[in-house]
Design a protein with these regions (language model features):
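N-proximal low-complexity "stem/linker" segments adjacent to membrane-targeting elements
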Residues: 1-30
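Active-site acidic short loop of glycosyltransferases
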Residues: 8, 95-98, 127
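Short, acidic, metal-binding catalytic loop of nucleotide-sugar glycosyltransferases
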Residues: 26-40
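Short, aromatic/basic amphipathic alpha-helical patches
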Residues: 28-32, 53-65, 149, 198-203
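Active-site-proximal specificity loops/subdomain of glycosyltransferases
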Residues: 44-96
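Short beta-strand-to-loop acidic/aromatic patch adjacent to the donor-nucleotide binding site
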Residues: 97-108
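Conserved catalytic core of nucleotide-sugar-dependent glycosyltransferases
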Residues: 108-188, 192, 197-201
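C-terminal catalytic/acceptor-binding lobe
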Residues: 174-304
Length: 304
């Protein structure tokens, strides 16, 4: 138990958040339970939430349940969905501990048993092929077999992932160092997808992956994309384990046309194709193709 608590003290739980004040306290405590207790540090960077949500933050801060808190008023220019990556980056970079646990309040954790998962996950971060330990996907991604009960994914999400803070700093320096150092001027090509696109590019370049536990009724982490009262309803159903089997392990499915959000009907192929087309026609889609091409060119350069 002492070793487990010592590892917990080395973790900073970090999140950028907007809204969802009604369920914030409950789900934050759900995350503590999932981890095995309050971690060494909790960092929350707000994106311009309403006063009711900010009041919840301040109460949690006064109670010692949030350790670092950054607020901006709702009228602040960074209250902008396309620039939320600024808050996400800040949440990670101001963390003080050697390990970062990314979480989102609309992402629901649950476990029965698996009490030693955190120290095992921290040990796995020293593997040469592991970028992070995580999950909470909404669709399939390229994946590979790992040790029994686990798989390796080509994706990593800030809905739920554990990584070394030093890895996060290295990723952002490699992928967007000049942009960050110059003060986030204008709009970045990836917009709000900056961090997760950076993770993907880094994993592809360095041949590392996210290690993910295969979900079963005793271990699930679901990204709901739910808000406010509906998020509270979804949480109650989730903790009661209602209809969870249909939402487990979306990354492992062969159906590339489906997005799964617990508590909502699946987003099927027609919408998926529209989303693909919309993404492909954005600067992010174009830039991601350029990045992938540069990675291929870099690997095949005979002078390297």
């Amino acid at each position: 138990m002492g070793y487990q608590l010592s590892k917990l003290s080395e973790v900073s739980m970090v999140s950028a958040n907007f809204g969802n004040g009604l369920a914030y306290r409950q789900i934050l405590l759900d995350w503590f339970k999932f981890l095995g207790g309050k971690p060494g540090e909790v960092v929350v960077v707000d994106g311009g939430s309403d006063s009711a949500t900010q009041k919840v933050y301040l109460e949690l801060y006064q109670e010692g349940l949030i350790d670092k808190l950054q607020l901006i008023p709702p009228h602040h220019p960074d209250n902008n969905k396309d620039r939320c990556f600024i808050q996400e980056y800040i949440a990670g970079v101001i963390a003080s501990n050697p390990y970062i646990l990314w979480f989102k309040i609309d992402t629901l954790p649950y476990r029965e048993g698996h009490d030693d998962w955190l120290e095992k996950a921290i040990a796995d971060l020293d593997r040469d092929d592991v970028f992070a330990v995580g999950g909470a996907f909404n669709r399939t991604y390229k994946h590979f077999e790992a040790q029994s009960g686990w798989y390796l994914s080509q994706a990593c999400t800030i809905n739920f992932s554990l990584m070394k803070r030093s890895t996060f700093v290295a990723v952002m320096e490699e992928f967007a160092g000049e942009y960050i150092a110059s003060g986030f001027p204008g709009e970045h090509e990836f917009g709000r997808f900056l961090l997760e696109m950076a993770f993907s590019a880094y994993m592809e370049r360095h041949k590392v992956h996210t290690l993910c536990k295969i979900e079963d009724p005793t271990w699930t982490v679901f990204h709901t994309n739910a808000q406010d009262e509906y998020l509270q309803e979804v949480r109650n159903k989730y903790l009661a384990r209602e209809d969870i089997e249909n939402f487990m392990n979306p990354c492992l499915t062969s159906d590339i046309s489906q997005f799964l959000y617990y508590g909502k009907p699946p987003v099927k192929s027609g919408m998926f194709k529209k989303m693909q087309m919309a993404f492909g026609n954005t600067k992010a889609g174009s830039y991601w193709r350029q990045i992938k091409k540069s990675l291929v060119d870099r690997e095949t350069d005979p002078n390297r």
